[in-house]
């Protein structure tokens, strides 16, 4: 990210939560796309939950972005959509008439604590990766995993 000045969106089929990838599969199908790629972030401060769920025990970094700079940059990227995730119970999802354009930003209520922000690339091509330029000044802070081995 620092050397290439890019962030990478990947195929959600690799996600653990198959409900999330299912919503994106439906979105892709309904929009007649070949692929929808995504990157998930959080608006929440660094927590134990994030380190324990999204990294292996000793690996990983936490990158804090300047929200306004990141959003302004994403707004200038052709074909990119982004926004906060909306959380709903499965019962509410069944009862509400959900607009197809909401699907990339919809998640089960049980995950509300994640306060997720998503960057989405709907593609008419069958690609597995989408790199987006990233201005380095949008990065405010980088933290190393607290369980990373100590240097010698």
What is the predicted function of each stretch?
Residues 1-152:
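Partner-binding and oligomerization surfaces adjacent to conserved cores of proteins
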């Amino acid at each position: 990210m620092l050397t290439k000045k890019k962030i990478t969106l990947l195929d959600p089929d690799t996600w653990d939560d198959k409900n999330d990838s299912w919503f994106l599969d439906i979105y892709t199908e309904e929009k007649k796309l070949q692929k929808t790629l995504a990157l998930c972030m959080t608006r929440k401060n660094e927590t134990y939950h994030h380190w324990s769920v999204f990294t292996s025990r000793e690996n990983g970094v936490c990158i804090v972005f300047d929200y306004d700079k990141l959003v302004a940059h994403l707004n200038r990227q052709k074909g990119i959509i982004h926004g906060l995730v909306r959380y709903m119970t499965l019962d509410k999802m069944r009862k509400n008439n959900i607009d197809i354009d909401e699907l990339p930003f919809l998640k089960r209520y049980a995950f509300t604590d994640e306060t997720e922000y998503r960057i989405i690339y709907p593609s008419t091509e069958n690609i597995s990766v989408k790199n987006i330029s990233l201005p380095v000044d949008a990065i405010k802070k980088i933290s190393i995993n607290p369980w990373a081995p100590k240097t010698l």
